[in-house]
Amino acid sequence: MERHDGEEYIPAIFGGQPPHASQVISLMKFSQETTTWNLPIMIAQALLVSEVIRTYPAELRMLHRLFQRKHPNMAEIFFILIKYLTIFAVIFDILVTETFAARTDFDCRSWAWTSSTFYFMCSTLVFCVIGWRARIIFRTSQVASWSLSVGLMGQFAVAMWTNYRVDKADALTPAGTCAPAAQVHADASQRNAALQLHFWQSSTFWFLLYNTIFESSILMACCIKLRKTSSGPSGLTKIAKVLFSNNVHYMAGVETCNVIELVMLLGWTSSLPPVHITSIAIQIVVGLQMLIGEQEAVYSPTCSQLSYSQYSSDSGGYINKHHAATSSSNGTFSTPSRTLSYVKRPGTGTTVADIGCADASGGGQHGRKGTFSSISSVPAYVKANPIVETVSPQMPSKAQSQSIPYKREVEVTVDMSPVPPPPGPSPAPLPAPYM
């Protein structure tokens, strides 16, 4: 096997003559500058390839749940689209930037455009995931729905405009590699024009600025909404805590990267390599992790009855029919004068704000169709028609108490309706007291 580190081209570079020290130094600097210029692209490729491999176990669990339900939910659709568009984008990007596979200008142009378009489509899909989560958190708010719709259309327009404007390796060089056509076919005067680029002329700057402002606004609004509507006695409820932490992690990762790149573009627009791919790669990685974390929280065994409510299938939300159909944690106790109902959940106080109870378990009445029940802080003791307690309830038998799985959600109903009189003639009235 031959060693391919570039040394085989050195004799051709210097015409077979022993190189001077200045020539060797210049060649080494050129090699280093080329590596540095392509570093953002290589970082993005490494991040995305590692993320694709890392998510396969979670994807297998997701496909197993999909096989059981026979139909996907919106989170699974978003995950599959983002992941496999990313795979194709990375493959074409590596072919263009790291190999000699291209043979014609058409190869470079088609692969470069496909890769770039898929990258920006993944960015828009991650933006759709954020908007979809926000729509569920804000429930039926028309203002939120219109704002998210307008923002999504704006993001898609800015993404496609940036995709059209950014440089792509769409021309074949004499060496057999792909490079931007402006470098391959343009003269020196056209090349120098790119060195006078200002930040407001950069489409990447406006793409990053739009994403940073709108995503940060949505995520901060979601955090405030969760704090207001999903706090119980011990803080945020279980699923609300997952949503809140994912929002914070997304802002800490993606928006911080965007702000750093925006500052760099403000000062050194003409001196920077393409940085939008690195930002999109971080956005994809955090977005996939956000989808995986929330799906695992919903469908994990410890959260089978403590997750999202029966979110309507026409809205494409989270739904867990298997858990709702197999719930066996309900108990009923009857005695003659009143009815008592309560829900017990480990790790909570007197509320079921974080319980996504299905209708079969009796807790669906507290949820709202099309929303997460984990976001509705309705105490268990709130009833539409409260009954005044007149007789204290009887304790259940020992056998019934042992059959209740206290480790999971338990709904107990004590029916104490009046006992009907026994059949037969009514008993004779008691004699009047002796006077």
From Swiss-Prot:
One of its GO terms (cellular component) is plasma membrane. It is found in: Cell membrane. Residues 418-435 have a biased composition (Pro residues). The chain crosses the membrane at residues 33-53, 77-97, 111-131, 143-163, 204-224. Signal peptide: none annotated. It is a multi-pass membrane protein. This is Virulence factor PIT1. The lineage of its organism: Eukaryota, Fungi, Dikarya, Basidiomycota, Ustilaginomycotina. The gene is PIT1.
